[in-house]
Amino acid sequence: MRNAELIFIPTPTVGHLVPFLEFARRLIEQDDRIRITFLLMKQQGQSHLDSYVKTISSSLPFVRFIDVPELEEKPTLGTQSVEAYVYDFIETNVPLVQNIIMGILSSPAFDGVTVKGFVADFFCLPMIDVAKDASLPFYVFLTSNSGFLAMMQYLAYGHKKDTSVFARNSEEMLSIPGFVNPVPAKVLPSALFIEDGYDADVKLAILFTKANGILVNTSFDIEPTSLNHFLGEENYPSVYAVGPIFNPKAHPHPDQDLACCDESMKWLDAQPEASVVFLCFGSMGSLRGPLVKEIAHGLELCQYRFLWSLRTEEVTNDDLLPEGFMDRVSGRGMICGWSPQVEILAHKAVGGFVSHCGWNSIVESLWFGVPIVTWPMYAEQQLNAFLMVKELKLAVELKLDYSVHSGEIVSANEIETAISCVMNKDNNVVRKRVMDISQMIQRATKNGGSSFAAIEKFIHDVIGTRT
């Protein structure tokens, strides 16, 4: 009987909501006592997100969705950092969520169901007071990796000694527990270089320490060093390595162009195995004209087949590409807009991935055994790139500290060199490591695997043993 309810509070963005929904699916499939209620906060311009939830809800039995009323006065992004804006948005929603929780807890239990605890996105840590008022445990679901968590732990403890923002161009090297190598300050999340973003992240870092536990979208196979570090931290919340939280048969991205998707997949079907490099820079990775031209020149130089998911903020692709480019690469290259990233990475023709290093994208590429070329753009992606290249030896370095707002132009020669390195099949150590990790993490999610066991432990801790 499903009589144990968990309240899930995700950040209302696709990149955070999708793994949240998949984690809900895992819990429901793994334990027949659990049902889940999602509280969905409302932002402007999220109709695509509402449609996605409506589409996927039919495939999630024992999950219900409750809309949090829209704020009468919404925080505005203005000159704020994104992190500061999101923190303000979540904090402003706390009273609305509190009212919903009071209603749930005061209503007669339906079918004997008891609310057992909260699971909230790390941006939603201000909701911890709602859980405390209800005398319920509060767990954080971190859609990123344990390296990021180690950095946040460092930030929480370091804040007591130093309350100043980091310098973007600093050559400082940080000794962060959980990392093997010194971490360059320049690869820290971009928010930490801006005063209000720094303040928001420090507040989140301190709130992490007050949670009952932290569920992380990673596994011991991917990040043994940082996860072993947390095993020895008696005064820090329990860390559960429950990843990879990823469904290779998931519903399409809500912004996906289905016609373009079909065309891309048909083109891949005609290509030899592991012969295509896929380039995609995420939902916010729009590129400027000069950079588009350098990428195009780099693709011409390297001579490998390519599929390029190109999104720009300027005019049309034809106006940005070098004159005659499509004619010169005819037959070995294709450009599309929105692409079905999961399906593309799963395709046997794809042998490499030039990525912005969002953690969801990294998880997908590792799952399918596709090695990455690192080209971070924003948020914590620079730290992810450093983690993948220097700590884990699972990626080829193009850039580690690139920022989409820097104005830096990456040269065609640099691009050609990195792509040639990742696509080279002779003595490719990174490719072999990635393929080995792929097999290991797929085993980890099955009964008897480490991630499956971590979910079991979380269920035991929040719900208890079966009676």
Swiss-Prot record:
Keyword Glycosyltransferase assigned: yes
PANTHER family cross-referenced by the UniProt entry: GLYCOSYLTRANSFERASE (PTHR48048:SF45)
Enzyme class: transferase
Domain of life: Eukaryota
Coiled-coil portions: none
Binding site for UDP-alpha-D-glucose: 283, 339-341, 356-364, 378-381
InterPro entries: UDP-glycosyltransf_plant, UDP_glucos_trans, UDP_glycos_trans_CS
Protein species of origin: Arabidopsis thaliana
Protein name (Swiss-Prot/TrEMBL): UDP-glycosyltransferase 71D2
